[in-house]
């Protein structure tokens, strides 16, 4: 699957390193929560994982292939839902017709189910949607793309409480043993019930890298009398 090895990155030659000798790996069938405050490097790490940014040193490999090479065989296995993005002035149906062929396992059935859960249909035009609605439409497309890696950057931003509930339902219904999902967020309460593994980062450093089952095993609950 996807493996980050000794990665270092900065946004310029004279800029300080945001990541240095950073290593991390994804396993199939796991939903990862990438947690940290704003500015901790979460979005940058997602872009490095998707091949949209290139590391200064080290590698990000998917099945042994460097994602920075941006080979079609690698890119068709990765889909990213950015925190903010622009979409063309077309309908979702037109967007699917143009872009679905890039993803060999694209499923119109999954797309239909996701849109139903979001109370949408593929006739919607992107330019007529709010940012939250655009995110639902694009999230549905990325889930339908059926890639082995799905990266989501602050997916609940712009969602009201019912929309957050819809999103959790959609993600849970479309997770599989072959897929890895990474959800980057600083609002852990929105997604905590979905997570199998937690990666906590700050200033480009790993503060925690552990499965949720290990966290549960280490917790001790002490009963205290009510005052």
Q: Can you annotate each of these PLM segments?
A:
Residues 164-177:
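Helical segment within the ABC ATPase nucleotide-binding domain
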Residues 32-37:
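The feature captures the beta-strand-to-loop junction immediately N-terminal to the Walker
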Residues 1-4, 8-21, 28:
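A short, flexible loop at the N-terminus of ABC-type nucleotide-binding domains that lies
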Residues 80-137:
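ABC-family P-loop ATPase nucleotide-binding domains
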Residues 50:
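Helix-to-loop junction immediately C-terminal to a conserved catalytic motif
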Residues 150-154:
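Catalytic Walker B motif of ABC-type/P-loop ATPase nucleotide-binding domains
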Residues 58-69, 73-74:
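Conserved ABC transporter NBD signature motif
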């Amino acid at each position: 699957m996807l493996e980050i090895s000794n990665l270092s990155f900065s946004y310029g030659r004279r800029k300080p390193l945001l990541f240095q000798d950073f290593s991390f790996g994804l396993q199939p069938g796991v939903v990862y929560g990438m947690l940290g405050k704003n500015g901790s490097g979460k979005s940058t790490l997602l872009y490095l994982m998707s091949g949209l940014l290139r590391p200064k040193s080290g590698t990000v490999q998917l099945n042994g292939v460097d994602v920075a090479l941006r080979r079609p065989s690698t890119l068709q296995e990765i889909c990213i839902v950015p925190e903010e993005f622009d979409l063309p002035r077309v309908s979702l149906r037109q967007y699917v017709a143009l872009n679905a062929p890039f993803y060999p396992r694209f499923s119109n059935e999954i797309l239909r189910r996701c849109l139903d859960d979001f109370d949408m249909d593929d006739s919607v035009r992107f330019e007529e949607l709010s940012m939250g609605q655009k995110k639902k439409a694009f999230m549905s497309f990325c889930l339908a793309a059926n890639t082995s890696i799905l990266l989501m950057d602050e997916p609940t931003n712009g969602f009201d409480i019912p929309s957050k509930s819809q999103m959790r339902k959609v993600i849970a219904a479309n997770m599989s043993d072959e897929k890895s999902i990474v959800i980057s967020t600083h609002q852990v309460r929105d997604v905590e019930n979905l997570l199998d593994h937690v990666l906590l980062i700050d200033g480009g450093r790993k503060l925690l890298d552990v499965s949720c089952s290990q966290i549960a095993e280490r917790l001790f609950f002490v009963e205290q009398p009510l005052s």
